[in-house]
C-alpha cells in the first residue's frame, strides 16, 4: 500500500525572502542594467537612465519578476496618492476658510492657500469674501467635503493624518511584497479570483460602505446644513451612528430599523434612498438621497458580480471558456487565444484598461456639469470649468497611452506563429482596408467641417449674412441631438414613470435652478453653431484614432519595412542608406498622436467654456431675468473662424492679459511663461540633430582651450529624445497656457 501525503488545501502562492533589501544597490545609478551601471561616457547616459528605469521588460525577460516589480510599483503609486490627498486635507485644515465657506457658500469663495509676503507676492491673496484673503481654489474639495458631512477643520486634520498613515502602510506593502513575500506568477494570472475580489471587494464593499456613510453621516448633516443650522450646533458623525433616535427625528422610518428590509417593505426607506432626479434647489447639486440610493444599487450589482467567477469551488464562469465561446459566423476563431494574451502580456492588459479608463474619465467630465454631484458645485464656475478641462485632458492622455501599450504589446509580446484566424489576426490581415477607409473618413470630415466655417467666414467678409450657415439664415440644426435631448426631457412620466424630474436639466423643459442669484443649471439649447463644432470634434477624434491605430496595426511590419518588429518599439529610421524610412516606429505614432489628441481636447474645452458662458452661466434678477456672462453670443459668433479668434480667444483673454497688479497676476505670468515653454518645444521639433552636434563640438573645443572640459563627453540629443522633449514641452506649455487663460477669465467674471 502506498501512503500519499495529503494534498495541501491551500496553494502556496508566495515566495519568501526572494530578493534581499540592499541600499547599496539602490544607491548605484542604473543598477538594473549592465550597460547603464558602468556609468557615463557621454551625456546620453542620463537620458538612457531615465528612459529605462521603469521599463521593466528591459531589465529581465522573466514574467514573474516583471509582474512583481509592477505590483510593488503600484503600492508606491498608492502611497504617493495618499500623501497627495493628505496634503489636500491638511491644507483644508490649516490654511483654508472652509468653516467660513460652509456657513455662506454663495458669497464666500473657497481658498486653501495663503501666500507669504516675501517680495510682495501677497498681492496674490485676493478677497474671497468673509474677510478672508487667499488664492481662490478650483479643485472642488470644499464641495466634496460638505457632501461627505465634514463640518470642521479638526475633522480635516484627522483625515489628513489618517491618509499619512495609509501612505506609510502602502510604502511598507510595496517593500514587503517584493522583498519579503513576493507573489508567484500563478497568483498574478488567476484572473477569476482577481475579478471576484476587485468586483466584490473594491467596487462592491467600497460602494456599500460609501452608501452607509452617506445614509448615516452625510445625509443628516447635510439636512441640517441645508436648513441653515450653524455647523457647530450639528451633532458629530459618531452621534448619528451610535444614536438611532437622532436619525429617526430626521427620517422617521429609521425607527423601524431593519424590519422593512426583511419584510420586503422597502418603500419605507424612500425617505433617504430616493429616486427624484433633478437638482436640490437649495444647493444646486444632485439630491444626496438619490446619490446614496445609487451607491447602494451599484454595491448590490458588484457584490453579485463578484460571485460570478469560478475559483476553488468549481462553480461559476471561467474567463477562458467565455472568451473561447465568443465567436460569430463571420469572425473565424473569435476570441480564442485572447485569454493567453491577456494573462502573459501586461502591455495588452494595460492597453485595454487605459482605453476603458480614459473613456470613462471623459464620461465623468461630461457628467460633472450636467449632473453636478456635490452641493454648491454648480454655481462655482471656476471649479466647473477646471473639473471639465482636467477630466478631458486626463482622458485624452489615457487613451493615447492605450495605443502606446497596444503597440508595445504588438512589438514585444505578440507571437504571430501561434495566432491564426482569431479576431486580432483577422484585423491585422485587413488593416489596409481599415486604415485607408479611416483615412478617407478623416479627409471627408476635415474638408467638410472646416469648409463650412470657411464658407461662413467668406460670406461674413462679403457682407452676405443671409448666405451663411446659422440659426438665422441657412439652418443646419443638429436634429438627432435635439431628438435625444427631447426624449430624455420627456422621460419622467413616459419611459421613467417613477422619476419626478429628468436625469439632467440640460435635456430641456422649462426648469431652471438658481442658487444665490447665480444660475446652477438650465436647459442647454443646441443649434447650427454646435452642429459645426461637433463636426470639428468628429474630425479631430478620427485623425487621432487614425494615427494611433496605424501605429498599432503596422507596429510589427509594413510594406515599407517588412521586418519592423526587429527594430523595436522606438527607432529613428531603418538604418543608414535607406532614405524615407524615418518616423515610422510605433513610438513615433504615439508622438504624432499626442499632437492630435491635444488638438481634439483643445477644441472640446474651448467649445465647453464658451458655450457655458454664453448659454448657461450667469446671474438671475429678482424678476427671474437671466443675464449670461457673454450674453448668448455663441450661436452667432462661433460659426466663423474669425468669431472664435475675436470673440472667444481675444475677447476672453483680456482678463489674463490685464491681470498684472491684481490678485490674478500669477495667471498673467503663467500665461506668459507657458507660452514660452510651448515656443521652446519648437526648437526641439524643428531642428536637426547634426546642427546641435556641430554646435556642441565647437563649445567643447572652447572648453578644451581653457582646460575645463568635462570627463563625460557632451552629445546632442538623439532624434527620439529630441522629439520626446519637444512633445513634452509642447503639451505642458499648451495646457498651462490654457489653464491660465481659463482661470483668470472665469475667476474674474464668474
Swiss-Prot record:
User: Cofactor note, please?
Assistant: P700 is a chlorophyll a/chlorophyll a' dimer, A0 is one or more chlorophyll a, A1 is one or both phylloquinones and FX is a shared 4Fe-4S iron-sulfur center.
Residues reported in the UniProt entry to bind phylloquinone = 692
Reactions catalysed: reduced [plastocyanin] + hnu + oxidized [2Fe-2S]-[ferredoxin] = oxidized [plastocyanin] + reduced [2Fe-2S]-[ferredoxin]
Localization: Plastid, Chloroplast thylakoid membrane
Binding locations of chlorophyll a' = 675
Which is a Pfam family this sequence falls into? PsaA_PsaB
Q: Mostly located where?
A: plastid
Looking at the record's lineage, which domain of life comes first? Answer: Eukaryota
Q: Where does [4Fe-4S] cluster bind?
A: 573, 582
Per the record, GO CC terms? chloroplast thylakoid membrane; photosystem I
Decide whether keyword rRNA-binding is in the record.
no
Q: What are its E.C. numbers?
A: 1.97.1.12
**Does the keyword Transport feature in the UniProt annotation?**
yes
GO molecular function terms attached to this record:
4 iron, 4 sulfur cluster binding; chlorophyll binding; electron transfer activity; magnesium ion binding; oxidoreductase activity
From the record, give the transmembrane residue ranges: 70-93, 156-179, 195-219, 291-309, 346-369, 385-411, 433-455, 531-549, 589-610, 664-686, 724-744
Which Gene Ontology terms describe the biological processes this protein takes part in? Answer: photosynthesis
Topology in the membrane?
Multi-pass membrane protein
What's its top-level EC category?
A: oxidoreductase
Residues binding chlorophyll a: 683, 691
Keyword line: 4Fe-4S, Chlorophyll, Chloroplast, Chromophore, Electron transport, Iron, Iron-sulfur, Magnesium, Membrane, Metal-binding, Oxidoreductase, Photosynthesis, Photosystem I, Plastid, Thylakoid, Transmembrane, Transmembrane helix, Transport
What family is reported?
Answer: Belongs to the PsaA/PsaB family.
The subunit field of the Swiss-Prot or TrEMBL record says: The PsaA/B heterodimer binds the P700 chlorophyll special pair and subsequent electron acceptors. PSI consists of a core antenna complex that captures photons, and an electron transfer chain that converts photonic excitation into a charge separation. The eukaryotic PSI reaction center is composed of at least 11 subunits.
Function, as annotated: PsaA and PsaB bind P700, the primary electron donor of photosystem I (PSI), as well as the electron acceptors A0, A1 and FX. PSI is a plastocyanin-ferredoxin oxidoreductase, converting photonic excitation into a charge separation, which transfers an electron from the donor P700 chlorophyll pair to the spectroscopically characterized acceptors A0, A1, FX, FA and FB in turn. Oxidized P700 is reduced on the lumenal side of the thylakoid membrane by plastocyanin.
- What is this protein identified as? Photosystem I P700 chlorophyll a apoprotein A1
Q: Which organism is it from?
A: Liriodendron tulipifera (Tuliptree)
Native organism taxonomy: Eukaryota, Viridiplantae, Streptophyta, Embryophyta, Tracheophyta
Q: Which gene encodes it?
A: psaA
Amino acid at each position: 500500500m502506498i501512503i500519499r501525503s495529503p494534498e495541501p488545501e491551500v496553494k502556496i502562492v508566495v515566495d519568501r525572502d526572494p530578493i534581499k533589501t540592499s541600499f547599496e544597490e539602490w544607491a548605484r545609478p542604473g543598477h538594473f542594467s549592465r550597460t547603464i551601471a558602468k556609468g557615463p561616457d557621454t551625456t546620453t547616459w542620463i537620458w538612457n537612465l531615465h528612459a529605462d528605469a521603469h521599463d521593466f521588460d528591459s531589465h529581465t525577460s522573466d514574467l514573474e519578476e516583471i509582474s512583481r516589480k509592477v505590483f510593488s510599483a503600484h503600492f508606491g503609486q498608492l502611497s504617493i496618492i495618499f500623501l497627495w490627498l493628505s496634503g489636500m486635507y491638511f491644507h483644508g485644515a490649516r490654511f483654508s476658510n472652509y468653516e467660513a465657506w460652509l456657513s455662506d457658500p454663495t458669497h464666500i469663495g473657497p481658498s486653501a492657500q495663503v501666500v507669504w509676503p516675501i517680495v510682495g507676492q501677497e498681492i496674490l491673496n485676493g478677497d474671497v469674501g468673509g474677510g478672508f484673503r487667499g488664492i481662490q481654489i478650483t479643485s472642488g474639495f470644499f464641495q466634496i467635503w460638505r457632501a461627505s458631512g465634514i463640518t470642521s477643520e479638526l475633522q480635516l486634520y484627522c483625515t489628513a493624518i489618517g491618509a499619512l498613515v495609509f501612505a506609510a502602510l502602502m510604502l511598507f506593502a510595496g517593500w514587503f511584497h517584493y522583498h519579503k513575500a513576493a507573489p508567484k506568477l500563478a497568483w498574478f494570472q488567476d484572473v477569476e479570483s482577481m475579478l471576484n475580489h476587485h468586483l466584490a471587494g473594491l467596487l462592491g464593499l467600497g460602494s456599500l460602505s460609501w452608501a452607509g456613510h452617506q445614509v448615516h453621516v452625510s445625509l443628516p448633516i447635510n439636512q441640517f446644513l441645508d436648513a441653515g443650522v450653524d455647523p457647530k450646533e450639528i451633532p458629530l458623525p459618531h452621534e448619528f451612528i451610535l444614536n438611532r433616535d437622532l436619525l429617526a427625528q430626521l427620517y422617521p422610518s429609521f425607527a423601524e430599523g431593519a424590519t422593512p428590509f426583511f419584510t420586503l417593505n422597502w418603500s419605507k426607506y424612500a425617505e433617504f434612498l430616493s429616486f427624484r432626479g433633478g437638482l436640490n434647489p437649495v444647493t444646486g447639486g444632485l439630491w444626496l438621497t438619490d446619490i446614496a440610493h445609487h451607491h447602494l444599487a451599484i454595491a448590490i450589482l458588484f457584490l453579485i458580480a463578484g460571485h460570478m467567477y469560478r475559483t476553488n469551488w468549481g462553480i461559476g464562469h471561467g474567463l477562458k471558456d467565455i472568451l473561447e465561446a465568443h465567436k460569430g459566423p463571420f469572425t473565424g476563431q473569435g476570441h480564442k487565444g485572447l485569454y493567453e494574451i491577456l494573462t502573459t502580456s501586461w502591455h495588452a492588459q494595460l492597453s485595454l484598461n487605459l482605453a476603458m479608463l480614459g473613456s470613462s474619465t471623459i464620461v465623468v467630465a461630461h457628467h460633472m456639469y450636467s449632473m453636478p454631484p456635490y452641493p454648491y458645485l454648480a454655481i462655482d464656475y471656476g471649479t466647473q470649468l477646471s473639473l471639465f478641462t482636467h477630466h478631458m485632458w486626463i482622458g485624452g492622455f489615457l487613451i493615447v497611452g492605450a495605443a502606446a501599450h497596444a503597440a508595445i504589446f504588438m512589438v514585444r509580446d505578440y507571437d504571430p506563429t501561434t495566432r491564426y484566424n482569431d479576431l486580432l489576426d483577422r484585423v491585422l490581415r485587413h488593416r489596409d482596408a481599415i486604415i485607408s477607409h479611416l483615412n478617407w473618413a478623416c479627409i471627408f470630415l476635415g474638408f467638410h467641417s472646416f469648409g463650412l466655417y470657411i464658407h461662413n467666414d467668406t460670406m461674413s467678409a462679403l457682407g452676405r449674412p443671409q448666405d451663411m450657415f446659422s440659426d438665422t439664415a441657412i439652418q443646419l440644426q443638429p436634429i438627432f441631438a435635439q431628438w435625444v435631448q427631447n426624449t430624455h426631457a420627456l422621460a419622467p412620466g413616459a419611459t421613467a414613470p417613477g422619476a419626478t424630474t429628468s436625469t439632467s436639466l440640460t435635456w430641456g423643459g422649462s426648469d431652471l435652478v438658481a442658487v444665490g442669484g447665480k444660475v446652477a443649471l438650465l436647459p442647454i439649447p443646441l443649434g447650427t453653431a454646435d452642429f459645426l463644432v461637433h463636426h470639428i470634434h468628429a474630425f479631430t477624434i478620427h485623425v487621432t484614432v487614425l494615427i494611433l491605430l496605424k501605429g498599432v496595426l503596422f507596429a510589427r511590419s509594413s510594406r515599407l519595412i517588412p521586418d519592423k518588429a526587429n527594430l523595436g518599439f522606438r527607432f529613428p529610421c531603418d538604418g543608414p542608406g535607406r532614405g524615407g524610412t524615418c518616423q515610422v516606429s510605433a513610438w513615433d505614432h504615439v508622438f504624432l498622436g499626442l499632437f492630435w489628441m491635444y488638438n481634439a481636447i483643445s477644441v472640446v474645452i474651448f467649445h465647453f467654456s464658451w458655450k457655458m458662458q454664453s448659454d448657461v452661466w450667469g446671474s438671475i434678477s429678482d424678476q427671474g431675468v437671466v443675464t449670461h456672462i457673454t450674453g448668448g453670443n455663441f450661436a452667432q459668433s462661433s460659426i466663423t473662424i474669425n468669431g472664435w479668434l475675436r470673440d472667444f480667444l481675444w475677447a476672453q483673454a483680456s482678463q489674463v492679459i490685464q491681470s498684472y497688479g491684481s490678485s490674478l497676476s500669477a495667471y498673467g505670468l503663467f500665461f506668459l511663461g507657458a507660452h514660452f515653454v510651448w515656443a521652446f518645444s519648437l526648437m526641439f521639433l524643428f531642428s536637426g540633430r547634426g546642427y546641435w552636434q556641430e554646435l556642441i563640438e565647437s563649445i567643447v573645443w572652447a572648453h578644451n582651450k581653457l582646460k575645463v572640459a568635462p570627463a563625460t563627453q557632451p552629445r546632442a540629443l538623439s532624434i527620439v529624445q529630441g522629439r520626446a522633449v519637444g512633445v513634452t514641452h509642447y503639451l505642458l506649455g499648451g495646457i498651462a497656457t490654457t489653464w491660465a487663460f481659463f482661470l483668470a477669465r472665469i475667476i474674474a467674471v464668474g
